[in-house]
Design a protein with these regions (language model features):
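Ankyrin-repeat boundary/"N-cap" motif
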Residues: 2-10, 33-40, 63-68, 91-105, ...
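Ankyrin repeat domain, specifically the short helix-to-loop turn at the C-terminus of the second helix
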Residues: 22-29, 55-62, 82-88, 116-124, ...
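Leucine-rich solenoid repeat scaffolds
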Residues: 37-58, 193-221
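Conserved ankyrin/ankyrin-like repeat signature
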Residues: 19, 52-53, 77, 110-114, ...
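Ankyrin repeat A-helix N-terminal signature
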Residues: 10-15, 44-50, 68-74, 102-111, ...
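N-terminal segments that cap or nucleate solenoid repeat domains
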Residues: 2-33, 72-95, 99
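Ankyrin-repeat and related helical/solenoid repeat scaffolds used for protein-protein interactions
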Residues: 161-202
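Alpha-helical adaptor scaffolds
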Residues: 127-131, 135-155
């Protein structure tokens, strides 16, 4: 007999929301299942770009954990978690991220509000993920193209020239992704437009290659 947990994660990976809903209807406890890496079903779905499935799973859960609440931008649930256990603002997920990394990367719901709440509770704006990605929340926000979260993190003192593996700065990611507002905020906060990644590429070169002419002009000014 197929393990129901395996069936759930198989359905998530296949993007089969109907199958997920059927499995959860038959066994609501499956919503609390975790994959082989200890990642919850809702987060597993988000990592695979399956937001609708993540929302379906979240709707069945009696309570979201701090990472799920942060990732889905559910500030009411997040505030309740932080009020009960303030230390959750600095705890790590099974895969090495802080809760602040999740609204920064996913940008779902009230991601900016979730970020502010976590920072107010003591989250480290410059915390690096304890995994091979070794990213700070600002890297996550610029990679995800979430200008509002970028602004929150910069206002909280994020290191605008911090490097992630391969030498990428937040400005590299924002320029490549065409996030004009984020590029503007990063420059205003002192980001170095001449910074090169490990293969010698600057932000303006990435913007030019991607056809982001307005950002090229901004970086040239």
């Amino acid at each position: 007999m197929t393990d129901p947990g395996s069936s759930l994660f198989g359905a998530i990976d296949a993007g089969d929301i109907a199958a997920v809903d059927t499995l959860l209807a038959n066994d609501r406890d499956l919503a609390a299942a975790r994959d082989g890496d200890g990642v919850s079903a809702a987060m597993h779905a988000l990592y695979r770009g399956q937001r609708a499935i993540a929302e379906s799973i979240a709707a069945v859960l009696p309570e979201l954990d701090v990472f799920e609440a942060a990732a889905l931008g559910r500030v009411d649930r997040l505030r309740a978690q932080l009020a009960a256990q303030p230390a959750l603002a600095t705890t790590r997920s099974a895969d090495g991220f802080t809760a602040l990394h999740f609204p920064a990367f996913f940008g779902i719901g009230d991601a900016a509000g979730a970020s502010r709440d976590l920072l107010a509770a003591g989250a480290d704006v410059n915390a690096r993920s304890e995994n091979s990605m070794s990213v700070q929340p600002l890297h996550s926000a610029t990679a995800g193209g979430h200008d509002d979260v970028v602004a929150v993190l910069i206002d909280a003192g994020a290191d605008v020239d911090s490097r992630q593996p391969q030498g990428w700065t937040p400005l590299h990611a924002a320029a490549m992704n065409g996030s004009f507002r984020s590029v503007d905020r990063l420059l205003a906060a002192g980001a170095d437009p001449a910074a090169r990644n490990d293969v010698g590429t600057t932000a303006i070169e990435l913007a030019r290659a991607a056809g982001h002419d307005a950002i090229v002009a901004l970086l040239s000014s």
